[in-house]
């Protein structure tokens, strides 16, 4: 909540007060169409995200497979894959931010839930929609390119040879921390009020964070940082290796999101103590 005031540098700025935290459990939300519209938006966005990105991964493997007539440097490469993931997040967050918040990732939803930005009901429904959307998105890839999908790994996440479990888990924790920390920073209403004279396009830094994390972690885990993305690919590909390593792509992102949420709320923002107090008061009701 803010009102326009004159800043010391002559810019128009805003006098700001933190909005109240979202109720922990809001049963009334279930009666509102806006909730279901947002859930549908999350489902469709995650479906499109997985469809385009998994197609990109498989296309790169086809074009770089020398046994199938490809060339060593064929296809988009790791850089192109990173652009595909980051670019799709930029596009989809831009399209859905005004409807659902543009989460497209259970780890992002979980982090925002911990910070009291979304209710428990909304968080659970979002995560279910994201996982179902991911399954459908990868399912479309397999339906349209069945032989290539099976032969080239199905875009599934697993720990690469030469890396131990600790390295893979750390990559997922740190990568998700970067993403969720960026989400909090880009969408911080206090920042928007303070820097109201600076046009900010929140999806841009979020998409760029995804791009940068993919460059760093594709060689290690194929880059999860999104449990729905890893889950959808594992369900449709359904091989032992992705399932054996699958826990990494839930535990790592959720730990990373938790650290990012608490760092932003309790270290960077003075509102952290208020959020903790609201959690305690909600538990005593």
From Swiss-Prot:
Pfam families: MIP. Induction: By dehydration. Not affected by water stress. GO terms for cellular component: endoplasmic reticulum; plasma membrane. The modification Phosphoserine is found at residues 278, 281. One of its GO terms (biological process) is response to water deprivation. Its main location: membrane. Aquaporins contain two tandem repeats each containing three membrane-spanning domains and a pore-forming loop with the signature motif Asn-Pro-Ala (NPA). Widely expressed, except in seeds. This is Aquaporin PIP2-3. It comes from Arabidopsis thaliana. GO terms for molecular function: water channel activity. It is found in: Cell membrane. The chain crosses the membrane at residues 38-58, 82-102, 124-144, 166-186, 200-220, 248-268. Keywords: Acetylation, Cell membrane, Membrane, Phosphoprotein, Repeat, Stress response, Transmembrane, Transmembrane helix, Transport. Residues 59-81, 145-165, 221-247 are extracellular. The gene is PIP2-3. It comes from the Eukaryota. Residues 1-21 are annotated as: Disordered.
């Amino acid at each position: 909540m803010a009102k326009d005031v004159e800043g010391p540098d002559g810019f128009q700025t805003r006098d700001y007060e933190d909005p109240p935290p979202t109720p922990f459990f809001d049963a009334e939300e279930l009666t509102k169409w806006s909730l279901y519209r947002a859930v549908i938006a999350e489902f469709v966005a995650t479906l499109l995200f997985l469809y385009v990105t998994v197609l990109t991964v498989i296309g790169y493997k086809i074009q770089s497979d020398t046994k199938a007539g490809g060339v060593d440097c064929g296809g988009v490469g790791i850089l192109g894959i990173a652009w595909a993931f980051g670019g799709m997040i930029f596009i989809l967050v831009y399209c859905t931010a005004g409807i659902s918040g543009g989460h497209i990732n259970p780890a992002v939803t979980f982090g925002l839930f911990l910070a009291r930005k979304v209710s428990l009901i909304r968080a659970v429904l979002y995560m279910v929609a994201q996982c179902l959307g991911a399954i459908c998105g990868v399912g479309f890839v397999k339906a349209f390119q069945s032989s290539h999908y099976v032969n080239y790994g199905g875009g599934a996440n697993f720990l690469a040879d030469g890396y131990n479990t600790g390295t893979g888990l750390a990559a997922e924790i740190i990568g998700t921390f970067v993403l969720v920390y960026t989400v909090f920073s880009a969408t911080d209403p206090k920042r928007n009020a303070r820097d109201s004279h600076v046009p900010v396009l929140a999806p841009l830094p979020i998409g760029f964070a995804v791009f940068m994390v993919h460059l760093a972690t594709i060689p290690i885990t194929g880059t999860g940082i999104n449990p729905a993305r890893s889950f959808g690919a594992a369900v449709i590909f359904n091989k032992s290796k992705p399932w054996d390593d699958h826990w990494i792509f839930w535990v790592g992102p959720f730990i990373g999101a938790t650290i990012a949420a608490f760092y932003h709320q309790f270290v960077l923002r003075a509102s952290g103590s208020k959020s903790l107090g609201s959690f305690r008061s909600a538990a005593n009701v």
